[in-house]
Amino acid sequence: MSVVPIEPVSRVLLRDQAVTLIRSAILSGELPPGSVVKDSALAGRLGLSVAPVRTALARLADEGLVESKPQSHTRVTPLVLRQVRDAAVVVRAMHELAVAEAAPAVTAADVTAMRAANRRFAVAVATGDLDTALAADDELHEVLLARCGNGAVRATIDRFTPAVRRLERQRFAAAHGHGSVVLHERLISACANGDVAAAVSTTTEIWTALLSELEETPDERS
């Protein structure tokens, strides 16, 4: 009987766990913009060794969520308008492409799932539950990403979304979040009717509304 070798995966799993936990702390504001992060202190809080935490911080630096100064410190990246705008423009383009590819193939089940997600989103925005609002927003757009099936589009969105997530939290915390409910319903209706042009233009409007708020957001770079 052949023996299947056991692969050493624990280090990778710990690294991924550290990335998820630290990213969540940054996006939720638990680690606020500009705050200094020490790998040893984070490792202690997470119950991990320093090695996976350092690897995680390097990955989060690639995502633009932390920045390191050699021989100095690592800190949570301030909300820098140009960087957020650059990322948001890319994410908008990818969502437009995903909708263009997905809309002609949307099923009745897809429409039902999106409408259910938008109902959860509306309730969460109305009650100020930001985490649930963001999760419901992700679920709605995930239906179209899954239907699109373009791995490169998904990878690009996953790569740049963290850079704009903090701005999204500000949007959904304000009255602007209520406008997203209406835009979502327009998007869903366009997909249900097979109106690709309307679905894409509504997606553009959703992201343009977010980009317009950059003009109202203070630059935290110091």
Predicted segment positions?
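Amphipathic alpha-helical repeat elements characteristic of tetratricopeptide repeat
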Residues: D16, R92, A108-R115, H178-V182
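C-terminal all-alpha effector/ligand-binding and dimerization domain
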Residues: S10, R115-A122, R169-S222
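Hydrophobic packing residues in well-ordered alpha-helices of helical domains and bundles
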Residues: V84-A87, M114, A133, D137, ...
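Hydrophobic, amphipathic alpha-helical faces that serve as interaction scaffolds
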Residues: V90-A103, D138-A174
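Short linear motifs at protein or domain termini
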Residues: M1-A100, P104, L211-S222
